[in-house]
């Protein structure tokens, strides 16, 4: 009987994996589209003509670009100027690699510029999806609005967030999340990818399973959010799920 149960469980996992893979290929289009835009258009245009187009900004010294995503009025992507696939890349655990989350947070002003009015920090979120939760194979951090319901939940559970990675009560969007508080000074000094790899057991060996997000807390500190792929709970580890690219939170703040 036990052998049958194991077989059925293995079969279920295989089916879920196939479904997840099918979803990925169905929605991915060309998974190298962003990489081609960055490496074949934005970077050469900046180098040769001092024009970042079609990117909004190319920072050659910092090793990143900012690119307006086609989804939503204010969503931007921060991407490296060289090849990095995603959260699974060993380069992200190299201390010499740029601190992309810090750069993305520093670049959030571009949302206000496009909006034509200040976008409050508590309405902004950063997110990078896991290997199974993304559709593009070039590293990209989504800079976009936070979902209003996620904002409310983070405010409600603020007391449960500490300087250690701990489960966020109730998770987010039906998925389990770990949360860790950081200050801007800490974020400037140390990459969240290193914090995750060095502080969460077994994370270093399986970084590609994780998605990371960040938002501001009500006290002005920042909260890092991490979720791990779990096919049994249909969690593809897409931290972008905490974002609202339509930016309804800006209407709620009026």
Curated annotation (Swiss-Prot):
GO cellular component: plasma membrane
Membrane topology of the entry: Single-pass membrane protein
Record-listed E.C. numbers: 3.6.1.26
GO terms (BP aspect): CDP-diacylglycerol catabolic process; phospholipid biosynthetic process
InterPro entries for the chain: CDP-diacylglyc_Pase, CDP-diacylglyc_Pase_proteobac, HIT-like_sf
HAMAP family listed in its UniProt record: Cdh
Protein's name according to its UniProt entry: CDP-diacylglycerol pyrophosphatase
Lineage: Bacteria, Pseudomonadati, Pseudomonadota, Gammaproteobacteria, Enterobacterales
Gene coding for it: cdh
């Amino acid at each position: 009987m036990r052998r049958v149960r194991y077989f059925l469980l293995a079969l279920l996992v295989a089916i879920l994996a196939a479904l997840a893979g099918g979803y990925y290929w169905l929605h991915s289009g060309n998974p190298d589209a962003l990489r081609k835009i960055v490496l074949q258009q934005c970077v050469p245009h900046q180098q040769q003509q001092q024009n970042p187009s079609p990117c909004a900004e190319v920072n050659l010294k910092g090793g990143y670009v900012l690119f307006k995503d086609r989804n939503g009025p204010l969503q931007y992507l921060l991407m490296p100027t060289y090849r990095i696939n995603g959260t699974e890349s060993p380069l992200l655990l190299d201390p010499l690699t740029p601190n992309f989350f810090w750069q993305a947070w520093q670049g959030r002003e571009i949302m206000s510029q496009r909006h034509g009015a200040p976008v409050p920090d508590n309405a902004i979120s950063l997110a990078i999806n896991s290997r199974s939760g993304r559709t593009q194979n070039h590293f990209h951090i989504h800079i976009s609005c936070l979902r209003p319901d996620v904002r409310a939940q983070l405010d409600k559970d603020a007391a449960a967030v500490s300087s250690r990675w701990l489960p966020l009560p109730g998770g987010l969007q039906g998925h389990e999340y770990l949360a860790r508080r950081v200050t801007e000074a800490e974020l400037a000094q140390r990459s969240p990818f290193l914090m995750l790899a060095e502080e969460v057991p077994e994370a270093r060996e399986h970084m590609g399973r994780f998605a990371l997000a960040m938002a501001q807390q009500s006290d002005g500190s920042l909260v890092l959010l991490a979720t791990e792929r779990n096919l049994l709970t249909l969690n593809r580890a897409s931290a972008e799920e905490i974002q609202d690219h339509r930016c309804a939170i800006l209407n709620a703040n009026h």
